[in-house]
């Protein structure tokens, strides 16, 4: 973190409330001697995201998983990543000036998508989760391997592979477990699994260590359709004739500013209970 920098990168959602908040924050920062910019500057002190969790995720991807610490002002609904509330903007700026914060390292997942009968592979990263499914809402058939061990022949709507940070997002809505954000592992969660004599699919999520290697092989049933979809934090990637998708922990990570020591438990209670 470049503590000598006065530059603040601002990423803002395009709704009216977020845009108005961004202008207010920009003015307040300038009054305190900061240099806010709506462009990305690699020498910035922080990346400030204004919006909801979607804005935070889009900023992380747009800034290519920069190690400049991210922090969010919440103008959305859930705001799990967005720690700063609009009434607390002045306190946020004061804490920033006085360095009253911690920095948390957040792990990323990496996927490699291989195309059948081709040497082509596509690599992506995700902060929250990857989702593998068909492009037309039909059943997807997958052989699931953990560290080269065959676990199951899955049939269903798809599979979510999520980080601890992402466990409170789509994974949670799909019936997956909430993993403490500091846990060293990730989660594999089925979407509408079929469990019958013909198909034996796990009905619940599976938590694996961070060193694990998870691979989803597309079975021959899938190749009568054209495309399959691999979603990275909601960003749609469509591929023809996928052979397999492999998931591992990434060597990259992002940093997040933390102003409240117990922010995680406060978030869990505030957002879900």
Curated annotation (Swiss-Prot):
Family listed: Belongs to the NAD kinase family.
PANTHER family, per database record: NAD KINASE
Needed cofactors: a divalent metal cation
Organism superkingdom: Bacteria
Main location: cytoplasm
GO MF, any single term: NAD+ kinase activity
Residue positions binding NAD(+): 53-54, 58, 128-129, 157, 168-173, 192
A single Gene Ontology CC term: cytoplasm
Identification of the protein by name: NAD kinase
Function description: Involved in the regulation of the intracellular balance of NAD and NADP, and is a key enzyme in the biosynthesis of NADP. Catalyzes specifically the phosphorylation on 2'-hydroxyl of the adenosine moiety of NAD to yield NADP.
Subcellular location: Cytoplasm
Catalytic site positions: 53 (proton acceptor)
HAMAP family noted in UniProt: NAD_kinase (MF_00361)
Record-listed E.C. numbers: 2.7.1.23
Pfam families according to UniProt: NAD_kinase, NAD_kinase_C
Catalytic activity from the UniProt record: NAD(+) + ATP = ADP + NADP(+) + H(+)
GO biological process: NAD metabolic process; NADP biosynthetic process
UniProt entry keywords in alphabetical sequence: ATP-binding, Cytoplasm, Kinase, NAD, NADP, Nucleotide-binding, Transferase
Segment forming the signal sequence: none
């Amino acid at each position: 973190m470049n503590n000598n920098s006065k530059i603040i990168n601002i990423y803002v959602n395009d709704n009216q409330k977020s845009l108005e908040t961004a202008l207010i924050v920009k003015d307040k920062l300038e009054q305190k001697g900061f240099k806010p910019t709506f462009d990305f500057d690699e020498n910035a002190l922080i990346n400030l995201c204004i919006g909801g969790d979607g804005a935070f995720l889009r900023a992380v991807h747009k800034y290519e998983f920069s190690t400049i610490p991210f922090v969010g002002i919440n103008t959305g609904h859930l705001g799990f990543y967005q720690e700063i509330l609009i009434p607390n903007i002045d306190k946020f700026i004061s804490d920033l000036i006085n360095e009253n914060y911690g920095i948390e390292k957040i792990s990323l997942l990496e996927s490699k998508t291989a195309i059948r009968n081709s040497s082509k592979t596509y690599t992506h990263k995700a902060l929250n989760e990857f989702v593998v499914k068909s492009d037309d809402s039909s059943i997807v058939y997958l052989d699931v391997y953990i560290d080269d061990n065959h676990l199951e022949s899955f049939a269903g709507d798809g599979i979510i592979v999520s980080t601890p940070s992402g466990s409170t997002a789509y994974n949670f809505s799909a019936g997956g477990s909430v993993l403490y954000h500091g846990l060293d592992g990730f989660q594999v969660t089925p979407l509408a699994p079929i469990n019958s004599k013909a198909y034996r699919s796990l009905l619940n999520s599976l938590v694996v260590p961070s060193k694990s290697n998870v691979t989803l092989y597309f079975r021959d049933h899938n190749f009568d359709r054209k495309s399959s979809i691999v979603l990275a934090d909601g960003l749609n990637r469509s591929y023809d004739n996928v052979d397999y998708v492999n998931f591992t922990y990434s060597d990259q990570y992002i940093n997040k500013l933390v102003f409240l020591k117990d922010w995680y438990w406060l978030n869990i209670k505030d957002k879900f209970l």
